[in-house]
Amino acid sequence: MYPTDLSDSAWKVIQEILADKRKRRYSLRSIINAVLYVTKTGCQWRMLPNDLPPWQRCYYYFHKWRNDGTWERLNKSLVCKRREKAGRKPSPSVGVIDSQSVKNSEWGVPDKGFDGNKKIQGRKRHIVVDTLGLVLAVVVHAANQHDSPSARAVVARLMAQGYGRLEKLLADSAYGEKLRQWAKQAYKLTIEVVKVCDLPGFHVAPMRWKVERTFAWMAWSRRLSK
């Protein structure tokens, strides 16, 4: 047992979403436990402890579920359940979009670039969260891509998941007029730029701070810190 292992109650929820009752040599629960272990500790796949399934099998499912949308389906189902538990409707009506550039290691990282604004060599993760800070969509790309044109990919991924009530995304000034027009025409989605107070000193941007908090949550896991 590791601190990252799924509890019985958590696995029961995920098992219902996966709806897969086939007998396997390695259970899907143990596979997900291995993925969570890698995410939290940041270890290499080949360095997985011996009491977890073979790393090749774990990576196979991680890669397969990334490509076939299983991770997105799991995330959406869990987001909807969490929102209902908080007394909200399953589908959000407002989201917050932002990006974060992070440094990468020298080896094994495709699509790297240099973010001239943040002075960071690495990749940029573009995310959309709801007003609870729950992640709705993610796209990762080279850090040298500007927020406005690359945001189309994350907006398209977000809308493809079928959040029917979504009407507005809150953003910073990096998201230009062309992007806002495109989102309105393509998805009838309003992208509203939330301005920071003009007074001297530090001021929290209304609602936009929630996406920054989500980035901070990500940093709790070593695999997501780079």
Describe the residue ranges of each PLM region:
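Short alpha-helical elements
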Residues: 1-226
